[in-house]
Amino acid sequence: MASSSSKASDSSSQRPKRPDQGPSGKDAAGLVALHGKLAQLKRQVQSTRLAAIKERVEANRKALQVHTCALFDVAAAAEVASRGAEGGNALSRGAAEGHRRFVGWDSASGPGERELVHVQEENLVAGTLVLSSSGGSGASHRTVVQLVKLPVVDKIPPYTTWIFLDKNQRMADDQSVGRRRIYYDPIVNEALICSESDDDVPEPEEEKHVFTEGEDQLIWKATQDHGLSREVLNVLCQFVDATPSEIEERSEVLFEKYEKQSQSSYKTDLQLFLDKTMDVALDSFDNLFCRRCLVFDCRLHGCSQNLVFPSEKQPYGHELDENKRPCGDQCYLRRREVYQDTCNDDRNACTTYNMDSRSSSLKVSATILSESEDSNRDEDNIKSTSIVETSRSKITNSEYADKSVTPPPGDASETENVSPDMPLRTLGRRKISKHASKSNDHSPDKRQKIYSSPFPFAMSVLNKQSVPEIGETCPDSIESAVDQLPSLDDPNKKISTKDMCAGSTTNTTENTLRDNNNNLFISNKEHSISHWSALERDLYLKGIEIFGKNSCLIARNLLSGLKTCMEVASYMYNNGAAMAKRPLSGKSILGDFAEAEQGYMEQDLVARTRICRRKGRARKLKYTWKSAGHPTVRKRIGDGKQWYTQYNPCGCQQMCGKDCACVENGTCCEKYCGCSKSCKNRFRGCHCAKSQCRSRQCPCFAASRECDPDVCRNCWVSCGDGSLGEPLARGDGYQCGNMKLLLKQQQRILLGKSDVAGWGAFIKNPVNRNDYLGEYTGELISHREADKRGKIYDRANSSFLFDLNEQYVLDAYRKGDKLKFANHSSNPNCYAKVMLVAGDHRVGIYAKDRIEASEELFYDYRYGPDQAPAWARRPEGSKKDEASVSHHRAHKVAR
């Protein structure tokens, strides 16, 4: 037993051989040896299994014995308690007394005391009844009872159970009326499952062999020692009751199983999850999430939809954070406050030392001091001329790079000594004093020295200058920054603070310090990237798309529990800021992730360049109601002269051409399509003013569409406080009146018995003309399925089918809302209208005239001339006309 387990563990620790790695054939001796090994292993497995079964049976026997003894103890205790209770068994005594009271009443009473009651009807008065009774003594009593006639009440109409739906649902695949429908045969008295097609008959599936644990050991041992050739498969078939193909498939499964176990032996579940990319982790969510309804497991559009990604992504940028508050203890804004205090103390220390210095560097220090005094002291950046001038040179380089213009020859020295690996972050909202620029223009040599200054403090602060913007970690003092850098000549020698402020070092020292600082920056960047997993990087990129360069929101919403705000800001500074300003040359230390993030940056820059290409301003396209789509086609559809076309989003990039799915189907591109907003086939909404969205002047209303707040300019959905960027609420309480279906602003509908037929729908509150009452919901079925169900509904003299578009029909028989009970009338007070709401066709019921409270709702089903049932035809129809009515599907049509 121990030897077999050790062998199994040794074989599982080794890398299993693939089936194609084994030899093509085996000699006779090898096959005989394999046969013997498998036979011995089979006996070991059988003996081990037998021992395990015996052990389990013994354990179950002991557990059953303990449980049975406990039940006996409980029963004995209950019996003792019942015997010791007062009054004996109350239940038995009560049953006996009841029997004597009701059954033995004659024996308890005397034979002459028995009373008999006789009911005798006499024709005294209509509606009266005489009751006579006699006792044992011979006395008789007569009582006259007057009957009360109950009024006749109509029978309650039959009611069918239905499921309430507040939104349309697509029919499930197994809900067809022709599949597995149960009929009861009165002749043979049995229920039969009848199907309209032979395809529904399930075919017998081949039984697959279920491998046991012992068979897995045999297969794994044979494949590890001898490969998986044809001869080995034939030998395995003698010990395993399976086909060679099944054994081969099982070997592949075992190989993957043990391979994953060997890989996961040194990794936790969290590490394995973080190593996956976001696409792999969200694979099931992508299939279940509906991007049109924004819900999971959508019943309307179904799962596994075609993913359509928009060609234009929302531009993102860095938000100003002067007025922001720290999001927590690990927020980069808190480190920014500490950084400001440290820099102010260091600046004061450098100023005090320069005033006492007698060296030739006093002039340079005085220049630095005078320039720092002219700068704004309220700014939260560095107050050093070296930092300002270096940043100024970077701003100049970035401007020349953006404009594709070569800088002047005189400025070449300014950018010559700037390290190319340093992040090219500009001081966007910082001001440079005019006095500093003038003084530096007169002394180019001094400016050159300042640029090439080897101050570790200046270089480290330059690397941290973006802390107010992105929160990079900075040392607490100048000494800590010096300690982090390696020494120049002596390993034990450190640079003093005075030397840093005076700037008295040689050119060799300058180059060495600059190289060391660059190496430190690169090492920090490599260290930052190495601690970010693939999933965390993908979440970071997704956060850049959603929230922009806001580390607080990214860390709080997408990287909660994984990364802090400080880590996100540091990662953004090391990877995102440098790539946004300069292209990556070759294979950088960022690898493929840097290329992916650079793609996001370039896509954003390209999108902005196209808009601001002419004269630096975005041109506003002027649209009128005539350019809102296809007015001619929509007008015919609105008048009911043409079928509505089902909308399916297209996946076109940029502009749509002739191959666009929307163009081929004759529909407009919507916001769910992948094409750009400037697509000529896109419906651009309306620009209506007050009270125009419910008139034919509105392009949305004219095209039988509801206004979309994402597309229409003046149609907003909010509380009106301006929190979403919309205009403030108007004083007259104006709201777009063409979004009733979208916002579900329906009226209260009551259900009651109708005076026409069956149940009816009633309005609770009075409504005015053209007011929205509610939505007619149900199952979305095909026209072929509607023909099948229509035949059954015609026999039941009911109609719940509603034509929606050329692809779907609404069926409210089993699923729907209360408006399904609204009856037909040739003179109705309501009308039905098909509206396109967020890309989906929906049926709305509107008031045709003013309707008072508690009135029943009627609308014209608009049956065809030969499809109306008898109860829906006009009164002047004769019996001959009724007999000639065809039994085709009776369907409702909206106007």
UniProtKB/Swiss-Prot annotation:
Low complexity bias: where? 1-13
In which residue ranges is the amino acid composition biased (Polar residues)? 383-399
Q: Which UniProt keywords apply?
A: Chromatin regulator, Developmental protein, Differentiation, Flowering, Methyltransferase, Nucleus, S-adenosyl-L-methionine, Transcription, Transcription regulation, Transferase
SMART domains in the cross-refs: CXC, SET
- EC numbers, comma separated: 2.1.1.356
Q: By its UniProt entry, which InterPro entries does this protein fall under?
A: CXC_dom, EZH1/2-like, Hist-Lys_N-MeTrfase_plant, Pre-SET_CXC, SANT/Myb, SET_dom, SET_dom_sf, Tesmin/TSO1-like_CXC
Which top-level enzyme class is recorded in the Swiss-Prot or TrEMBL entry? transferase
Under PANTHER family, the record lists: HISTONE-LYSINE N-METHYLTRANSFERASE E(Z), HISTONE-LYSINE N-METHYLTRANSFERASE EZA1
Spell out the note in the miscellaneous section. Answer: Down-regulation of EZ1 delays flowering in short day (SD), but has no effect in long day (LD).
Family per similarity comment: Belongs to the class V-like SAM-binding methyltransferase superfamily. Histone-lysine methyltransferase family. EZ subfamily.
Protein name in UniProt: Histone-lysine N-methyltransferase EZ1
Which organism does this record belong to?
Answer: Oryza sativa subsp. japonica (Rice)
Name of the coding gene: EZ1
